[in-house]
Amino acid sequence: MMRILLFLATNLAVVLVASITLRLLGVEPYLNANGLNMNSLLIFCFVIGMAGSLVSLFISKWMAKMSTKAKVIEQPGNATERWLLDTVGELARDAGIKMPEVAIFPAQQSNAFATGWNKNDALVAVSAGLLERMRPEEIRAVLAHEIGHVANGDMVTLALIQGVLNTFVMFFARIVAQLVDSFLRRDDEGGGLGFFGYMAVVIVAEIVFGLVASMVVAWFSRFREYRADAAGAKLAGSGAMINALARLKAETQMPDQMPDTLTAFAITTGQTRKLMERLFASHPPLDDRIRALKESAYRE
């Protein structure tokens, strides 16, 4: 509840700042005079922007199962599945959350992810390759990392941030289009953009603003990885968490087998070396994560 209240308060503050700034700059009266109601536009963009993000959140478990072909363990069929259920249950109790669904997905790359609209209605999944190649204490650390994501409410927070950014990408893209249209109509002979011209400007502006928004989301995603690593270290031990990340680092040359829609929720996405790749990366470099744990900079 506190997260929702903080989100609403932050969103209201951003709306007020944007409204005041546009009014002080004379943009709002100018646009209103040219037929664009700022408040109505903002409400429209908020509803559409948040709806898309929240729908994605609510169907995230279903989408994750479908896209990875994950098999939920309802009744353990072997000792490994029994151990997996017991370990997740123990970690969930220690983290103060309800038992999530546990699944295994068929990928040779060592990976895992957590998703779900609620920390008490989540899904934690690990790859078959991870179970084959990692030691039990390392698997436990990876599971603790994912439980940390769930306990921290990262999926919900990320969806809310994405919804706010969706709102402002749509909002400012249409303001830009309206300004261009009004500029072309500045005299009696100007015909403006027309419908297709207006939509073309909106699309281009949404792409530009969307790239900036993606960097913001990626920054938050990287930050939450450090927090999840810290939670994993707290639940499973720093040594085990560091060893698990080191094992993942050894596999960074293996092709990434995670669907694009789940890369932000996986424990690793491979290596990113170039500056632009780092700006849009959902995960920090594994070396940085290992260093942070060793220095206890992010340990909770």
UniProtKB/Swiss-Prot annotation:
Cofactor note (record): Binds 1 zinc ion per subunit.
Binding-site residues, Zn(2+): 145, 149, 225
The UniProt record lists the keyword Protease: yes
Pfam families: Peptidase_M48 (PF01435)
UniProt KW keywords: Cell inner membrane, Cell membrane, Hydrolase, Membrane, Metal-binding, Metalloprotease, Protease, Transmembrane, Transmembrane helix, Zinc
EC number: 3.4.24.-
GO-annotated cellular components: plasma membrane
Broad class of enzyme this protein falls into: hydrolase
GO terms, biological process: proteolysis
Cofactor(s) needed by this chain: Zn(2+)
Subcellular compartments: Cell inner membrane
Membrane topology: Multi-pass membrane protein
Active site: 146
Transmembrane feature ranges: 4-24, 40-60, 153-173, 193-213
HAMAP family (UniProt xref): Pept_M48_protease_HtpX
Protein family membership: Belongs to the peptidase M48B family.
Protein name: Protease HtpX
Organism: Chromohalobacter salexigens (strain ATCC BAA-138 / DSM 3043 / CIP 106854 / NCIMB 13768 / 1H11)
This protein's encoding gene: htpX
